[in-house]
Every structure is written in C-alpha cells, then in structure tokens.
Amino acid sequence: MINDVISPEFDENGRAMRRIRSFVRRQGRLTKGQQLALDNYWPVMGVEYQPTPVDFTALFGREAPVVLEIGFGMGTSLVTMAASNPQQNFLGIEVHSPGVGACLASAHEAGLNNLRVMCHDAVEVLENMIPDSSLDMVQLFFPDPWHKARHNKRRIVQAPFVELVKSKLKVGGVFHMATDWQHYAEHMLEVMSGANGYRNLSEQNDYVPRPDSRPLTKFELRGQRLGHGVWDLMFERKE
C-alpha cells in the first residue's frame, strides 16, 4: 500500500526551499463507480482546498474530536474507522482521484456523516487549512518508504514535517504511523525520538502493538501470511 503526500525540502535554518514529492502522481483511469461517486458524493463529503483555516465545527456540523488521515489509499481502513467511531470526525487526504472516488463510494454505502475527504497536497493542507492545536490524532499508514538511499529524502517523515504535525495536534493528541518496511520504521523512530515535545507511547520506547483502532487491511493480512512485519509507532504531543 502506497499513500500519497507531498514533502517539502528545508534548508539548515528550517526554511522551505523546493518541494520534494514523496509520490509519483499516477492518476490511473477512474472506474464508472468511482466517477459516479465523485460526481454525486463529492459535493457532500468533499472539501476543496483553500489557503485559509477550516472551521471543523462548521465543516462537520458538530463539535467532536477530529482525526486526520494522510494518504488513505482506497479508503478501506478510513471508512471502517469512521463507521466504528461515530463519536469522532474524520478528515482524509489523498492525491489520487481513483482512491478518493472509491472512498466516497464506500462512505456513502456505509451511510457515514462523520467523514470528509480532500484531494490535495497534504503538507499544504496542514500548513494552510488545519488550525493549530485542533487535531486529536494524525494517522500516516504505510507511506511510500522510498527504500533506495538516493530517494530517502522523499520520505514524508522528516524533522520539519513532524514539527508541523505537532503544531496541529492538541496537547495530548497522537501521531500514529505504521509501515511494513523495517528500515523506514527505524527511520521514523529516529526522527520522532529526536523531535521535541513528543512522548513515545511504547513502554520500550520503540514500537507499539497494532491498536484495535487501526483495522487490518487485506494488504497487511497478505503480508503477515508471507512473514512480513508491520511496525506501529504512536507519539503523543506533550507540550
């Protein structure tokens, strides 16, 4: 599973220079069902990008904890979580329109009213649309590991990005990551352990067991049968 976001490159002073994409945009062909969902359900559940902070109470029509998922793929897990947690509001970001269409179709079939989706650069959304200290959780599941050394800078989990995420989390909010690439898990752990203002929720200060809140995907189950590992990391904003 490859999730899709955009990661900026920063200089030594933390200034954004040019954007390094952590994905290759391959839109693919929309199925009839995906196109139908985009046509019919985007006006209800879709959120257009705008460079101004969003009002979550107005967006969802109620006040409730907000969970942001970055790169939801086809939306299977996101829809499952939203259906299982009606007391929470969910906002998903995905740059590939077939995935957005599939998610909208599943969400409509499930009768969800606590889910909204965006089709845009996740970093821009975080920077410009998400109010500071507004999120209860940020989820990043199975992002592209960019396993070749020359591509490591494309990985979304870098020090400036985790600082940006922290600024959007409430104190006590959690950044939850999962990957099936051990080297990327080690990279995530190194970056997060070096970031100020986070507390690792692992008792051993490394990885946590998969929480029940993160559904097992078909992809993950297949990997387990093949003996592949999966690493979950959960870090709480403490200040």
Swiss-Prot record:
Q: Which SUPFAM superfamilies match?
A: S-adenosyl-L-methionine-dependent methyltransferases
Instruction: Report residues binding S-adenosyl-L-methionine.
Output: 69, 94, 121, 144
* Key words of the record: Methyltransferase, S-adenosyl-L-methionine, Transferase, tRNA processing
Any one cellular-component term (Gene Ontology) = tRNA methyltransferase complex
What PANTHER family is this protein classified in?
Answer: 3-DEOXY-D-MANNO-OCTULOSONIC-ACID TRANSFERASE/TRNA GUANINE-N 7 - -METHYLTRANSFERASE (PTHR23417), PENTACOTRIPEPTIDE-REPEAT REGION OF PRORP DOMAIN-CONTAINING PROTEIN (PTHR23417:SF14)
The UniProt entry, under InterPro entries, shows:
SAM-dependent_MTases_sf, tRNA_(Gua-N-7)_MeTrfase_Trmb, tRNA_methyltr_TrmB_bact
- Active-site residue list: 144
Instruction: Specify the protein name.
Output: tRNA (guanine-N(7)-)-methyltransferase
Q: Name one Pfam family in it.
A: Methyltransf_4
Signal sequence interval, chain numbering: none
Q: What is its EC number?
A: 2.1.1.33
Q: Which family does it belong to?
A: Belongs to the class I-like SAM-binding methyltransferase superfamily. TrmB family.
Q: How does it assemble?
A: Monomer.
Name the source organism: Yersinia enterocolitica serotype O:8 / biotype 1B (strain NCTC 13174 / 8081)
Pathway involvement of the protein, from the record: tRNA modification; N(7)-methylguanine-tRNA biosynthesis
HAMAP family in the cross-refs: tRNA_methyltr_TrmB
List of residues binding substrate: 148, 180, 217-220
Which portions of the sequence form the region Interaction with RNA? 150-155
Q: Which CDD domains match?
A: AdoMet_MTases
Q: Which GO terms describe its molecular function?
A: tRNA (guanine(46)-N7)-methyltransferase activity
Kindly state which reaction or reactions the protein catalyses: guanosine(46) in tRNA + S-adenosyl-L-methionine = N(7)-methylguanosine(46) in tRNA + S-adenosyl-L-homocysteine
Summary of the function given for this chain in its UniProt record: Catalyzes the formation of N(7)-methylguanine at position 46 (m7G46) in tRNA.
